[in-house]
Design a protein with these regions (language model features):
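Conserved NTP-donor binding/palm subdomain of two-metal-ion nucleotidyltransferases/polymerases, i.e.
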Residues: 1-36, 42-265
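NTP-dependent small-molecule kinase module
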Residues: 214, 218-238, 428, 433-489
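P-loop (Walker A) phosphate-binding loop of NTP-binding proteins
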Residues: 272
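Conserved lysine of the Walker
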Residues: 277
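Hydrophobic positions on the alpha1 helix immediately C-terminal to the Walker A/P-loop
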Residues: 280
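Short beta-strand-centered segment that lines the nucleotide-binding/catalytic pocket of NTP-utilizing
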Residues: 290-307
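ATP-dependent small-molecule kinase phosphotransfer cores
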Residues: 302-401
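A glycine- and Lys/Arg-enriched "phosphate-lid" helix/loop adjacent to the NTP-binding pocket
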Residues: 379-457
Length: 489
C-alpha cells in the first residue's frame, strides 16, 4: 500500500469516519497501489471529518470542466504521494448514483444499510458481498442492457467487468441475496434479478437482454433523477460530442476534463540551456494531463498571431527584393562592453511582434488557469532576465543613434511586457554554466554560457519563486518540481 493511502485510511479510522470501498473489490490491491481509483461511499454524518482528513493530507478537490456533467453527491479529490510520485484519486460518493457513464441518472437510496453491512477487508472496509453484487447487477444492466447502450455498441460487459461479476458471484449466498432484495430493494423481485443476471452472461439471447433491460428500467423509475427521455437525449448528445472531439483533436481523452475547484495554476519553468527544462515540462504535462485540463505554452517561442504573420511576410518580401540584408541581431549577446553592430530596423520590428505574441500567449494562459486548468509555461518574461525572453530593442540598438523610430519601437515592446504579470509558481532550474556547456553540445559554448550565466548569477527571491538544483539527475529535478507544484495549489 502506498504511504499516502496508508496514512489516509489510518486517519479515517482514527477520526471515526463511516465509509466503505463500495465497488470493484475484486481489484483492491491495485487501488491500494494507486493504480485504480479509491471509490468510497461516505456516511453523511462523517462528511466533515472526512473532508478534514483530506485537507490535512493535501488532497485537492477537482470537478468537471463543464458543470452540467458534474454529478450531485459524487466528488473527486486528488492527492500526491511523493514517495511513489503518483497522483491518488479519491472518488467520494455520498449517494449511490448509478447509470450509464454519460449521465448516471439513478439514485438507489440504500446508503445506510450498505455501510452497515461493511466490514474490514485486507486493505479497506468493504460491503457485504450480497449488497455489492446486487448493486453491481443494477449498474451493469443500466450500463449495458438498455436500447441506447446496445445501439451504441456498449451492450456487452468488458473483460474486467466480467471478471468482477465472476468474483462476486462466487462469494454470494442466494438466500442472502433474496433477503437483500426483499428488505432493501423491494422494487426488484427475485425473478427479475435472476433474469438480469442471466442477461449479463456472454451468450444470452438478444431478446432476453433487451426485455430484462426494459423491465429493470421500469422497476427503477422511482429512482430516476431525470425523465427517461431526457436521459436518453443527454446520452446521445454527449456521445456525439465526444465522437466529434475525437475526430477534431487527435490526443483528446475523456478523462482530462477536470479542473481544480479552487482555481488552476500558471506555472513557469525557466532555466538556461542544458538545465533540463524540456524534460521537466514534458514530465509535468504527462503527469497531469490524464486527470486534468492541462495546457503547455512556449513563452520563449510564442505562437505567431495573424498580425505577426502579416508583418513578417512583408519583411521577408523586402529582404527578398534586396531592401536590406538578412540579420540575426536578436541572437547576439551584446552588452555595454560589447555593443556589437546595429542589426537593422527589421530585427527590431520582429522583436515588437515577439513581445506582442508573448503578451497574447500570456493572456490566453492566464484565462485558462483562472478557469481551473494547469498551464505550464516553457520560459517566461522576467524583469531580471536580459538575454532570454525580455525586451530586446534597447540592447540590440546598442550605440546606434537613438532616433524617434527606435524609441517608438522600444516603447511598444516594453508596453507589452509590462502587462505580463508574474506566474503563480516560478521554478528556476539552476545549472552550472560549465555543466550546461557539456550538456548542450549542439550549440556554441558562448551562446550556452551567456544564457545559463544569467540564470546562475541572479539572486532569485520571492514567495512564488523556487530554485531547483538542475545539476541533479533529471528524475530528481522532475520529482522536486512535481512536489512544489502540488504543494502550492
Amino acid at each position: 500500500m502506498l504511504p499516502l493511502i496508508e496514512k489516509f485510511f489510518k486517519a479515517l479510522g482514527s477520526e471515526g469516519v463511516i465509509y466503505c470501498h463500495w465497488k470493484s473489490t475484486a481489484s483492491l490491491a491495485a487501488a491500494a497501489q494507486g493504480e485504480d481509483d479509491l471509490d468510497l461511499l461516505i456516511s453523511h454524518e462523517s462528511r466533515q471529518a472526512f473532508l478534514g482528513v483530506l485537507h490535512r493530507l493535501g488532497f485537492k478537490e477537482a470537478w468537471m470542466s463543464k458543470r452540467a456533467s458534474q454529478i450531485p453527491g459524487i466528488l473527486d479529490y486528488y492527492g500526491y504521494d511523493e514517495t511513489a510520485c503518483k497522483l491518488i484519486h479519491v472518488h467520494a460518493h455520498y449517494k449511490l448514483i448509478l447509470g450509464q457513464d454519460m449521465t448516471k441518472n439513478y439514485h438507489v437510496p440504500i446508503e445506510n444499510v450498505y455501510l452497515e453491512s461493511s466490514f474490514q477487508g485486507e486493505f479497506f472496509r468493504i460491503p457485504a458481498p450480497e449488497f455489492e453484487f446486487s448493486v453491481f447487477v443494477i449498474r451493469m444492466m443500466l450500463k449495458h442492457s438498455t436500447w441506447n447502450a446496445i445501439l451504441g455498441g456498449q451492450g456487452r460487459l468488458s473483460g474486467r467487468e466480467r471478471q468482477e461479476m465472476e468474483y462476486l458471484h462466487k462469494r454470494v449466498s442466494l438466500e442472502r441475496i433474496g433477503q437483500v432484495l426483499t428488505n432493501h430493494l423491494p422494487f426488484l423481485n427475485s425473478a427479475l434479478f435472476d433474469d438480469c443476471v442471466r442477461s449479463l452472461q456472454p451468450r444470452c439471447p438478444f431478446r432476453v437482454r433487451v426485455k430484462a433491460g426494459e423491465q429493470i428500467q421500469k422497476a427503477l423509475q422511482g429512482c430516476r433523477l431525470q425523465p427517461k427521455g431526457i436521459d436518453i437525449w443527454l446520452q446521445f448528445w454527449r456521445r456525439l460530442a465526444m465522437a466529434g472531439k475525437r475526430r477534431l483533436f487527435r490526443n483528446f481523452r475523456r478523462e482530462n476534463t477536470k479542473t481544480m475547484k479552487n482555481g488552476g495554476m500558471l506555472v513557469a519553468i525557466v532555466g538556461g540551456d542544458g538545465a533540463g527544462k524540456t524534460t521537466v515540462i514534458e514530465g509535468i504535462v504527462e503527469w497531469l494531463s490524464p486527470f486534468f485540463v492541462t495546457m503547455k505554452v512556449h513563452m520563449g517561442k510564442p505562437t505567431w498571431s495573424w498580425m505577426t504573420i502579416l508583418i513578417r511576410g512583408i519583411l521577408k518580401v523586402g529582404r527578398s527584393l534586396g531592401f536590406y540584408p538578412f540579420t540575426r541581431g536578436s541572437m547576439d549577446f551584446r552588452d555595454e562592453e560589447n555593443p556589437g553592430s546595429f542589426p537593422g530596423y527589421p530585427s527590431l520590428i520582429r522583436e515588437v511582434c515577439t513581445g506582442r505574441d508573448r503578451y497574447l500567449s500570456y493572456v490566453k494562459a492566464r484565462k485558462q488557469a483562472d478557469k481551473g486548468a494547469f498551464v505550464i509555461c516553457d520560459r517566461f518574461p522576467l524583469p531580471r532576465m536580459i538575454f532570454m525572453d525580455g525586451p530586446q530593442i534597447e540592447r540590440m540598438a546598442g550605440t546606434f543613434p537613438n532616433n524617434w523610430f527606435i524609441r517608438l519601437l522600444g516603447r511598444l515592446e516594453s508596453r507589452y511586457y509590462r502587462f505580463i504579470s508574474l506566474p503563480d509558481l516560478l521554478c528556476v532550474l539552476k545549472v552550472d554554466p560549465d555543466t550546461a556547456v557539456e550538456r548542450k553540445s549542439d550549440e556554441t559554448a558562448a551562446f550556452v554560457r551567456a544564457r545559463t550565466k544569467e540564470i546562475w548569477e541572479n539572486n532569485w527571491e520571492g514567495s512564488t519563486v523556487h530554485v531547483i538544483d538542475a545539476n541533479r539527475s533529471k528524475m530528481e529535478v522532475l520529482d522536486r518540481t512535481k512536489a512544489l507544484l502540488w504543494a502550492h495549489l
